[in-house]
A protein has these predicted regions:
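Long, contiguous internal "core" modules enriched in hydrophobic/ aromatic residues
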Residues: 1-268
Length: 268
């Protein structure tokens, strides 16, 4: 799902803008990216466990076997390369395997052969590999994992994981985050009330296109992975310290896509 907001940028500075305004926004954004990476690391580990446990019960090498996945999702042919989605994922996995410097990879391959079982292979996957494999899984399997996170629609959950992978790439590559127009936008429940906090975003393209929605998804998922986490409280504290500007145009976390009254559900 991608939507572009119409924005007008000029080379003119807002009246009374000072250099310190740009510096403080940069520092705010830098800390925000660090907070995001902290959450996504734990969510990534949780998803690895979810996939390894579910698929590994039935097939030790499910990640190497297209028949363990949804035939349509895994068998879709990319027009540009002529390869199936599964084959493209295999290429990615082999690249991660070849680049891995982990001792356990070398040890296992020397002792047991070239193919890592699923519960070992997951340790070298990045967020993108996790997202792509999840998207190839059978509907019942995707829904089982989605349900663990309180999401009733597997398609919505799949889009959440994909968008968090995008968020992870932005944060890891030091891209500006706080007011970015997000080109990979997650889906939301069709009906209000399915996930209470989502109600503030449903049908609001201007909010869906901003990063606060992805922060909210990260909050939702990390509270499942780490029930006693205080990550969301640290994020709230950081957001409430949004830097004041000297310029006539006053920026705020509303420019991040934060809906009115977000604090009410964020701390729960």
């Amino acid at each position: 799902m991608t939507k572009q907001l119409s924005t007008v940028r000029t080379d003119q500075f807002e009246t009374k803008t000072q250099f310190v305004d740009a510096v403080e926004l940069y520092l705010f954004d830098k800390k925000l990216r660090l907070l995001v990476m902290d959450a996504l690391e734990r969510i990534e580990i949780g998803l690895r466990v979810d996939i390894a446990y579910l698929l590994g019960q039935r097939n030790t090498f499910a990640h190497l076997d297209a028949t363990a996945l949804h035939p349509t999702f895994a068998g879709k042919v990319d027009k540009r390369s002529g390869k199936t989605t599964f084959d493209i994922w295999q290429d990615k996995y082999k690249g991660l395997l070849d680049r891995s410097k982990e001792d356990f990879v070398k040890h296992y391959r020397e002792k047991h052969g070239p193919h890592l079982p699923l519960w070992v292979a997951v340790e070298i996957w990045d967020f993108g590999a996790i997202s792509q494999l999840l998207a190839m899984m059978k509907v019942a399997d995707q829904q089982q994992i989605a349900s663990k996170y309180g999401v009733n629609d597997w398609k919505v959950f799949k889009s959440w994981v994909r968008s968090l992978s995008y968020l992870r790439n932005l944060s890891a590559h030091h891209s500006r985050l706080w007011n970015r127009n997000m080109t990979d936008q997650p889906g939301l429940p069709t009906h209000k009330g399915d996930i209470d906090w989502c109600d503030d975003f449903i049908g609001k393209a201007d909010l869906i296109a901003r990063p606060f929605l992805l922060l909210s998804i990260a909050r939702h998922m990390i509270k499942v992975v780490c029930p006693r986490t205080e990550w969301h409280l640290r994020v709230q504290q950081h957001l409430q310290q949004f830097p004041l500007q000297h310029s006539n145009r006053k920026l705020s976390i509303a420019d991040m896509g934060a809906p009115a009254g977000w604090e009410g559900w964020w701390i729960k």
